[in-house]
DNA sequence: CGGTTTTGACCCGCGC
DNA sequence: GCGCGGGTCAAAACCG
């Protein structure tokens, strides 16, 4: 009897213990959940702070860029004079991005009439092409030099819209822009990006609306025409053409024009490299080809790029399907201290790395870019996972 | 229902 | 001046 009672006592005790254990476990779990919630709140706060900071920074950058563009033409004159004094090899007559000789008499008259207006307006339209790459942890001094070159080049970047722009934009708000472009007789710099990608609609950070498709005579594969739809008046266009019939074949994307609106984070990150390429191309008049080439090597150190002028369109072509390894880098490229992480669905492995440089075409297959974007994305994922 | 894509027609620069 | 061909328009279809 005693044994039975003892056993039943211990069974009851075990039951009580088990229940109390469960309660403790429950409490602990609740506490954990509470902690996670608190952390979640903190992260939310942090995220909103980061976003606020980013937005305010973006505003400041736009402001500063606007001011610098206004001042850059004066600065350019100053630098040109310095160049002359330094006996640099400068070919002033070469003006890539312009085709002044093609201006008709009719257009010349218009230019005379509105040239003063153009000088003022063009200052506001020297924004960078809205695409490019993200480059992290770059040597500050080198970047400063390059950015300086880019700014100077942007001052020269007076592009013209072709007749298609005249047709496409009929509202009066755009008329000034169109007249300006028409009168100067200039053609826009184009940047071609060749990338092997299964999806032709490369997400380069902007929103695009397809407005046409055409099969060219010389190429049986259709070419698609897209217009930037982030702003109703944005003049930026792109053409996408597949380079081969296979599904895996590369796409050639040709960008043309300047965005008239703030770019999203991805796009503004992307803007640096190709914008630099376009700008450097257009600054070919004031810098030697070797220095231009070297500068592009900094922005596109592991891929082929070429410069050409087709149909009076100065064109920078970036071939992301063909890795360009360090033997082709400029001598002073800081390979020893940093490296590059890039994976554009290219079968070739990226060079060995100790620091990260990231080219980030979101939508293309990129490899672990620890950019602000990805950090924010991770935060968002974590937050949504916890809620 | 609003935004996007499709697609035939049209425009116009350019070469001959 | 004419024809070719790249680029754009715009209405209809499609989609979420």
UniProtKB/Swiss-Prot annotation:
Keywords: DNA-binding, Nucleus, Transcription, Transcription regulation. Residues 329-346 have a biased composition (Low complexity). It is found in: Nucleus. It comes from the Eukaryota. The keyword Transmembrane helix does not apply. Disulfide bonds: none annotated. One of its GO terms (cellular component) is nucleus. The keyword Nucleus applies. Transcription factor. Interacts specifically with the W box (5'-(T)TGAC[CT]-3'), a frequently occurring elicitor-responsive cis-acting element. This is Probable WRKY transcription factor 36. The gene is WRKY36.
